[in-house]
């Protein structure tokens, strides 16, 4: 896949890279000096330097040697549909890929004699979340009067309130980690990368889910930040 891009996020941050470096270990998501230098070189015209970088990360793309998408039912496992090898056009192709998967699924259900119908109360859209920092001063004051949690700034870098974090926790798909809260609300996404707000987010998440702080994960399962001290 191609590498070496420079794009601006809706929030105003720049994303640099990737390097598109091939690795042999599928678990290797490390960053190295060579890759970071290459990513920085992709955005020299924007005057971005090392001092401006607040986080570096890497991922591994499971590309196919045929350089093509794999969208098909499994020949081994019943009920499994492969959607793999999705590369650069994946975002643009997502609606069409979803339709292909739907057609494969319906075809397989038909073969098995299974019936189906559209869910009557299906809601394809989720309510738009309130972004406190984008509201006018009058709207902010009104919201704080209705719910004082919106008057408590948890993440100072991104101006994220306790109310927004609780809204995210109260969503149909419940975030269960600090990283999930960051992705939903941007708390911890700023310059300090959670250095200030992480302990508060951890506490809010633990209280909302009636868990101990030592049970809250940072990212995936069993990545808890705190550990109980055994006497």
Model-predicted segments: where are they?
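C-terminal catalytic lobe of FAD-dependent flavoproteins
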Residues: 1-11, 22-153, 160-171, 189
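Short helix-coil junctions and helix-kink-helix linkers
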Residues: 184-188
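Iron-sulfur (Fe-S) cluster-binding segments and ferredoxin-like electron-carrier domains
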Residues: 27, 161-172, 195-213
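Short cysteine clusters
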Residues: 155-157, 192, 197
């Amino acid at each position: 896949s191609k590498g070496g891009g420079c794009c601006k996020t809706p929030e105003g941050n720049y994303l640099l890279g990737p390097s598109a470096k091939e690795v042999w270990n599928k678990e290797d998501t490390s960053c190295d000096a060579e890759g970071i230098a290459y990513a920085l070189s992709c955005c020299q015209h924007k005057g971005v330097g090392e001092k401006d970088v607040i986080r570096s990360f890497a991922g591994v793309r499971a590309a196919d040697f045929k350089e093509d998408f794999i969208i098909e039912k499994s020949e081994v496992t019943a009920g499994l549909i492969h959607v793999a090898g999705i590369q650069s056009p994946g975002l643009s192709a997502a609606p069409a890929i979803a339709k292909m998967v739907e057609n494969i699924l319906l075809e397989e259900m038909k073969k098995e004699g299974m019936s189906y119908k559209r869910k009557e109360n299906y809601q394809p859209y989720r309510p738009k979340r309130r972004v406190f920092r984008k509201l006018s001063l009058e709207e902010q004051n009104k919201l704080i009067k209705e719910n004082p949690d919106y008057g408590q700034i948890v993440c100072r870098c991104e101006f994220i309130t306790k109310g927004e974090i609780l809204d995210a926790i109260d969503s149909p798909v419940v975030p269960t980690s600090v990283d999930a809260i960051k992705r939903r609300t941007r708390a911890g996404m700023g310059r300090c990368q959670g250095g200030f707000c992480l302990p508060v987010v951890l506490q809010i998440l633990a209280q909302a889910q009636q868990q101990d702080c030592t049970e809250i994960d940072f990212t995936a399962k069993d990545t808890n930040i705190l550990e109980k001290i055994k006497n």
